[in-house]
Design a protein with these regions (language model features):
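Acidic (Asp/Glu)-rich catalytic clusters
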Residues: 60-65, 85-98, 126-136, 164, ...
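Bacterial N-terminal signal peptides
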Residues: 11-23
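Active-site beta-loop-alpha junctions enriched in small/polar residues
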Residues: 41, 76-77, 103-107, 143-146, ...
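Mid-to-C-terminal alpha-helical segments outside catalytic/metal-binding sites
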Residues: 6, 11, 27-38, 47-77, ...
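Hydrophobic faces of well-ordered beta-strands that scaffold small-molecule active sites
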Residues: 36-40, 71-73, 98-103, 140-141, ...
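Catalytic pocket-lining loop regions of alpha/beta-barrel enzymes
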Residues: 149-250, 297
Length: 298
């Protein structure tokens, strides 16, 4: 069954490639609907106790101007997310809903060590119990695994099971091999694959994983090979999205301060290729898929 679905995606990609030059020449208008930013960091260097270079009012105004109506906020440390969640007047004025995730990183050292540190699991439990001013945490992550074998470790296993037991979404920056290992710990978990494989997993492999794991979704920031001429989707990716319109999300990945001045252009880039999709598919990827993850909050 999975093989058949992958073959169908391949045939659709071939048909789209034939008409690619015509499609680029007749681009549709940019998508104008709401956006859900499913991968946003508000790290310490951005806000720095509200006196940093990008205070809450600044970043929320960037979201408002970009038509972003909801965000998955996850930050190093979690104080950044709680700062945004606590800015209730400003988020209301900007029309932005903050969906808070628990990040595993208290500091930069945790990026490379969280999967061998039992105190991380306790920290996640404590944060979950406390919640935020915007309500309970709705997910865990983003976390990184640069060696997929670490996805099979005890800390990763406990976190995946904790997420599934508490209906939390997981945001993971991992390769395709780690997707299999993480899902083996908790087959019912909802997992967002950050960047849909930043290492550039082939489209065929992405299609296989989507077919294998119905609760897996792909987030598309930094995804190699996603767009081609005119900022439109490359044929294979367009085919995959048309075949799986409910499985993709967009994100800014503001992992470094240099991403904040680019925020509006990043969202404009998404609007460009979303505009080349059928209207219902564009709205699902741009907004509805993210909102559905967190209903009835949105």
């Amino acid at each position: 069954m999975i093989v058949d679905r992958v073959r169908r995606v391949g045939r659709l990609a071939a048909l789209l490639a034939v008409s690619w030059s015509v499609a680029v020449a007749a681009q549709a208008a940019d998508y104008a609907g709401p956006l859900f930013d499913a991968h946003l960091h508000y790290n310490e260097e951005a806000w720095d106790g509200r006196s940093g270079p990008y205070p809450p009012a600044d970043v929320l105004s960037r979201m408002r101007r970009s038509g972003v109506r909801a965000i998955i906020a996850n930050s190093r440390p979690n104080d950044g997310t709680k700062t945004l969640a606590g800015a209730t007047r400003q988020t209301a004025e900007a029309g932005v809903t903050v969906v808070p995730f628990i990040r595993l990183y208290r500091n930069r050292a945790d990026y490379d060590n969280w999967f061998r540190d039992d105190t991380i699991y306790k920290m996640v439990q404590d944060e979950f119990a406390r919640g935020t001013a915007a309500g309970p945490y709705r997910g865990i992550g983003e976390f990184h695994l640069y060696d997929s074998r670490n996805a099979d470790g005890p800390v990763a296993a406990r976190l995946m099971k904790f997420a599934a037991a508490n209906d939390l979404v997981v945001l993971a920056h991992v390769d395709d091999a780690a997707i299999d290992l993480l899902m083996a710990h908790a087959p019912q978990a909802r997992l967002i694959w950050a960047h849909t494989g930043i290492g550039g997993a082939p489209v065929e492999r992405v299609a296989q994983l989507l077919a294998r794991y119905p609760r897996l979704m792909g987030e598309l920031s930094y995804r190699p090979g996603l767009t081609c001429d005119g900022g439109q989707l490359c044929p294979a990716w367009r085919a995959l999205m048309l075949a799986n319109p409910g499985r993709f999300l967009i994100g800014s990945d503001t992992w470094t301060n240099s991403r904040w001045p680019q925020y509006e252009s990043l969202m404009s880039g998404y609007r460009r290729w979303l505009g080349g999709l059928p209207a219902d598919v564009a709205r699902r990827i741009g907004w509805e898929n993210g909102a559905a993850l967190h209903a009835p909050r949105l």
